[in-house]
Amino acid sequence: MAVKPHGGTLIDRVLKGPAREEALKRAKELPRLFLDRWEASDLELIANGAFSPLAGFMNKADYENVVDNMRLADGTVWTIPIVLGVASGEAGSLAPGREAALCAEDGELLGLIKVEEIYDYDRRREAEKVYKTTDEAHPGVKRVYERAQYLLGGEISLISRRRPGQFPEMYLDPSETRRIFAEKGWKRVAAFQTRNPIHRAHEYLLKCALEICDGLFVNPLVGETKSDDVPAAVRVECYNVLLSRYFPADRVFLSAFPAAMRYAGPREAVFHAIVRKNYGATHFIVGRDHAGVGSYYGAYDAQLIFDNFEPEELGITPLFFEHAFYCRTCGGMASRKTCPHGGEDRVFLSGTRVREMLSAGEMPPEEFTRREVAEVLVRYYAK
């Protein structure tokens, strides 16, 4: 039996047929709000059910409960605010109970929102609670501080879907991945979230998960990330070359997660798990410093946060892993749970050192990354 969506029902707010045509007509007479890429991706992920049980951008009660208690107003576990900012000038044209058209930055109509409420909020409080810092150098905090003056809550409907030019076949809705897992006969599905190329340490975690699950769902985030993160197209090439050569084809499935990266560390780990549950996963891999950035979070804070919730509240099983490394004496990948040897036997490379090597055209050691993956990255850094 497939895992139930979060909240019990997979949301579908994508308009089709006559309902879509009618919405297109209404939109011509409505006030227009322009969404940036982050908000547009949230709109689509609400509509296709990835953010179930949300049916729209959060109202004040849900927003404040999520910020303070990591739950929606009805008690459902939810850790990240999903909100739509609106400037004071725009707010004047809106009224509760009325609709507004939601448009992309280039003016394309994306959908509609039925305005429930327009409310003020405390940016600093959100930063402290959600990101554990008020430092504007944190990319998530910076985003909060730059957001518009008010927030707009209300149910949405999606009219137009924007498919990217790159790897459109990888963009699947939760209803589609759930069907695929069922067709494959997978009852236990381990999901893996990543915004980086997969190196040997990640490969080790994935194969450990595959030992206890029927299938592996590799679901890289391909929405907005930091400017110095490896671009999605390069990462997808890395994923394809690794999975095709070092994993059984019938036990792994690769699909894109078109969300923006929040860099909210522990809270985002829970959020990522819930979303993958909606995609049909039963287990979720949580490694060292999941969704972290800089030194804002402890190495295993993203695992400890799960202690705040009962297993039945989450409905997905987290798989916690220690930081993995190659041990020369063991002759393979290990962690401090399985390896008795000292630091001199362990191959560790910092991200900074790896980028320096790749930029210089040097191949990182095989103990750190597969040669095929390194070759893709060397070509990218050589540009």
Swiss-Prot record:
* Organism of provenance: Pelotomaculum thermopropionicum (strain DSM 13744 / JCM 10971 / SI)
Upper taxonomic lineage: Bacteria, Bacillati, Bacillota, Clostridia, Eubacteriales
List, alphabetically, the Gene3D superfamilies matched.
Answer: HUPs, Sulfate adenylyltransferase
Q: What GO molecular function annotation could you give as one example from this UniProt entry? A: sulfate adenylyltransferase (ATP) activity
What is the recorded name of this protein?
Sulfate adenylyltransferase
Q: Which UniProt keywords apply?
A: ATP-binding, Nucleotide-binding, Nucleotidyltransferase, Transferase
Q: Which PANTHER family match?
A: PTHR43509, SULFATE ADENYLYLTRANSFERASE
The EC designation for this entry is 2.7.7.4
Gene symbol of the encoding locus: sat
GO BP terms, alphabetized? hydrogen sulfide biosynthetic process; sulfate assimilation
Q: Does the keyword Cell membrane apply?
A: no
Task: Say which family it is in.
Answer: Belongs to the sulfate adenylyltransferase family.
- Catalytic reaction list: sulfate + ATP + H(+) = adenosine 5'-phosphosulfate + diphosphate
